[in-house]
Amino acid sequence: MDKTEKVEHPFTVFTLGRICYQKNPTLFNEIAEKLPEIRFVWIGDGEFREELKSKNIEITGWADRATAIRYAVNADVFLLPSRWEGLPISLLESMYMKKICVVSNVIGNRDVIKSRLNGFVCDTLEDYVQAIQCAKDNKVGNMAEKAYLNILEQFNTRVMSMEYQNIYENRQ
C-alpha cells in the first residue's frame, strides 16, 4: 500500500504525539469511552500511556513518518484535546489532509480553528462527543475543505514569510 493510499476502514478518530500531560490523554480516554462504537488511534507513545484504558483506543507506539501518515490518511477526525499549545503542526497537517479537526479551546488551536467553520473548538467533554458525532453522521458540510483552503491561504511559506517581513520592517 502506498503511504497515502486510502483503504476501507471503520470511522476513526486519531491524534499524534507524545502521550503526556500537555496532550490530555485522560480527556482523550473519556471521549473514547463515550463513543465505544468509534475507533480511536493515538500515534505515538509516552509516560501517560496508562491513561488510555478504553478498549476502543489503539496506541501505535512511535512510528516513522510514512507509517504515521498512513494512519492519518485512513482516519476521519483529528482530535487535539491539549491543555495548551503553541502553533500545533499536527493540526495544520491534518487540515491540509482535509480531516475534520476537533480541538481544545486554547491559544494555538483557536487561532487556527474557527468553530463550526473549519473545525470544532471544544470546552467540555460533551462538546467533543457532539463534534465527533456530527462528523460521524456527516453533518459537517464542507468544513474539511474550508480547513484545507485556510492552510493554502494563510499558512503557506510565502504568506508567512511576507507576514514576518512586515513585522521586521515595521519595528521601530
Task: Tell me the role of every PLM-derived stretch.
Residues 51, 92, 106-116, 120-121:
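Short acidic/histidine- and often glycine-rich active-site loop of Leloir-type glycosyltransferases
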Residues 6-23, 29-33, 40-41:
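Conserved donor-binding/catalytic core segment of Leloir-type glycosyltransferases
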Residues 50-66:
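Nucleotide-activated donor-binding/catalytic signature segment of Leloir-type glycosyltransferases, i.e.
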Residues 100-103:
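Short hydrophobic beta-strand element within catalytic cores of glycosyltransferases
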Residues 83:
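Aromatic "clamp/platform" in nucleotide-sugar-dependent glycosyltransferases that forms part
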Residues 115-126, 134-139:
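Conserved acidic donor-binding segment of nucleotide-sugar-dependent glycosyltransferases
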Residues 62, 70-75:
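Short alpha-helical donor nucleotide-sugar binding micro-motif in glycosyltransferases
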Residues 141-169:
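A charged, aromatic-enriched C-terminal amphipathic alpha-helix characteristic of glycosyltransferases
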